[in-house]
Amino acid sequence: MSAIIDYKNVEVLRKELLVLKNVNFQLEEGQFVYLIGRVGSGKSSLMKTMYAEVPIEMGEARIFDYDLSAIRRKDVPMLRRQIGVVFQDFQLLSDRSVYDNLLFVLKATGWKNKTDIDERINEVL
């Protein structure tokens, strides 16, 4: 079985500070992982690299067939649809309805067709 997530010697800088150094791991289909650690240990930065929100400075990182160090902006929504992420502190937008909060997330992940969006939101609600 081949890895669906494969990180080799990954390094990440945030505001010129090295926050991840020499990260190496593989995750195969059906496996899962918990990221735990002290505040400031790089957990969120690592997750944000997987979500293509934080760039990889050095090394190689692949999720499915996406090279995270060279992913095209137009491919990011498709990548994000394939990844299940549970954020520690997720906040709804308090000035919006539940429908509008879900609409915001779907649009942010690349959904464009209004009929498909409405169907998906109605499934969830």
Walk through the language-model features, giving the residues of each.
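The feature captures the beta-strand-to-loop junction immediately N-terminal to the Walker
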Residues: 36-38
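ABC-type ATPase nucleotide-binding domains, specifically the catalytic core motifs of the NBD
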Residues: 103-116
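ABC ATPase NBD coupling module
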Residues: 68-84
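Helix-to-loop junction immediately C-terminal to a conserved catalytic motif
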Residues: 51
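Short coil-to-helix segment of the ABC ATPase nucleotide-binding domain corresponding to the Q-loop/switch region
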Residues: 95-104
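Conserved ABC ATPase "signature" region
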Residues: 66-67, 115-125
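Conserved ABC transporter NBD signature motif
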Residues: 59-67
